[in-house]
């Protein structure tokens, strides 16, 4: 198991030097953030990124992510050219020795929260999702804004894309995902790249949009789309646990049994009323996930891939990208490493 850390490039207030000082830290999870979605990442740009990371004494463990263009998700005629570009990016990453790619198939919006700075009694702040608040939000008219909404969409463009998805139900989205997988995975497999689809976050429909990578049944359906280790998942326990109907340990065990876990996101959340939840500190006592059992499963199944502490609280007066500060994620990384050491030594 390789401890890794998300880094958002030169614009990230958390530096590679900061990250390299975290005990047990080996890898960086990053991407090229200024190439428009759908265009090819050149080998030159990948080399530049790799050299920068390695100069700090680290390595690129995972690319998170190579975004999937909306036209692919919608099944538009332009998808074939866009998939060709995606395949070329996968090949270019493989040529530079990068073998794991995280991606998602969420329509329009990435991870969704209703507050980026919910304040706990101790003064720390965290990301939360309030189901009641989310139902009042209108992505088209913008009466309420949502953290993570893509500012690159004008109101007219947002309306157009939301209207387009009105014609896409869950089965149609599965059909479009299947088309993508059947084109991508053979090419990824041929160059030794493991793809790792991230679950929908949260793992249920919002704003009437279909969401399909949501739980155990979805994972079992997904892995059958193409029988290859290259067609794997990102086991994001915090995302799966955000649906109170999901048993995240059952999901984790089954995913490992299927040998499709290519990347692990380890963060904790505290379930609230209905489908509301708050992100918490990583230790089990603060959330609804038994992190010790998650790490035990990683060891039991011999997981050797990258794991990273996911979103953290903002603590000790830190400011920066919500969920992606240094301090709480560093605490999370050392906590996870401590659990891993305890599991290994306790199993002897």
From Swiss-Prot:
Pathway: Carbohydrate metabolism; pentose and glucuronate interconversion. GO terms for molecular function: ferrous iron binding; manganese ion binding; mannonate dehydratase activity. Its EC number is 4.2.1.8. Its cofactor is Fe(2+); Mn(2+). The keyword Metal-binding does not apply. InterPro entries: Man_deHydtase, Xyl_isomerase-like_sf. Belongs to the mannonate dehydratase family. This is Mannonate dehydratase. It comes from Streptococcus agalactiae serotype III (strain NEM316). The gene is uxuA.
